[in-house]
Amino acid sequence: MEEFDSEDFSTSDEDEDYLPSGGEYSEDDVNELVKEDEVDGEEQAEKTKGKRRKAQGIPARKRKQSGLLLEEEEDGKEDSGGSSSEEDEEEQEGGLGSENARKKKEDELWASFLNDVGPKSKAAPGSQTKVAEETEEISSNKPLVKADELDKPRESEKVKITKVFDFAGEEVRVTKEVDAASKEAKSFLKQTEREKPQALVTSPATPLPAGSGIKRASGMSSLLGKIGAKKQKMSTLEKSKLDWESFKEEEGIGEELAIHNRGKEGYIERKAFLDRVDHRQFEIERDLRLSKMKP
């Protein structure tokens, strides 16, 4: 058995180291081997060519894509630039239009203000013409207003009134200033208007012949004249008050006396205060009596 095993191992080694010679291969085997080698070489060459083509094609496509992107971006920028320029022009036109409208509004407001107040040196030319026309109309209407004002006296105007009184057989004339719209001034004006026609009637223009009827007429007219010309009598108290008022006007102490009387030492103010106190006390007592009388 051992010999058999050693022989087997030797044969296996010999088989591995055995190389057949070229003469032992047939032509068909050689042709097949050559074809297989050619096919393998072609496949490897195609693989390497395909890899190179892939490597060369990727950056070209990328470049083409980047070129397209850049062109699109440039076109977009140009479009955006054109649109932005158009928008800027539109905004400028809109700004000019708004400024013009604002200026027109300011001019109109200024003109209306000038119409209410009067013409100014810095006014617009259109407003100046309007104001000039209005001033001309006002100046043309002024004389009519003045004529009306002259016919009717104002309320603030003062009118001097002279009254004649009889004091102990003496004629006393009193002059004072009152408002033109007061009752006293109106009555005085009416009285003067009545006295004017009477004076014209009583003064004879031509001498009349003597006669009984004429004498009676003249006697009656004289009596009526005496009755109409009867003077109002003045009492002693009124005369003393009149003298005191005239003295104050001559000396110019009216304001000083008024200030003095308003103070604590003034007799008139004290008397008025005491009168108010008495009146208030009377009202309180009356209210108490009425409250007790109620059931």
Curated annotation (Swiss-Prot):
Biological process according to GO: cell adhesion; fibroblast apoptotic process; negative regulation of fibroblast apoptotic process; regulation of cell population proliferation; regulation of cell shape
User: Where do Acidic residues bias regions lie?
Assistant: 1-18, 25-43
Phosphoprotein as a keyword?
Answer: yes
Residues bearing N6-methyllysine are: K215
Region spans: Disordered: 1-153, 188-217
Q: Sorted alphabetically, which InterPro entries does this protein's record hold? A: BCNT-C (IPR011421), Swc5/CFDP1/2 (IPR027124)
Which keywords appear in this protein's UniProt record, sorted alphabetically? Centromere, Chromosome, Developmental protein, Isopeptide bond, Kinetochore, Methylation, Phosphoprotein, Ubl conjugation
Q: Where is the composition biased (Basic residues)?
A: 49-65
Q: Which PANTHER family match?
A: CRANIOFACIAL DEVELOPMENT PROTEIN 1 (PTHR48407:SF1)
Q: What is this protein called?
A: Craniofacial development protein 1
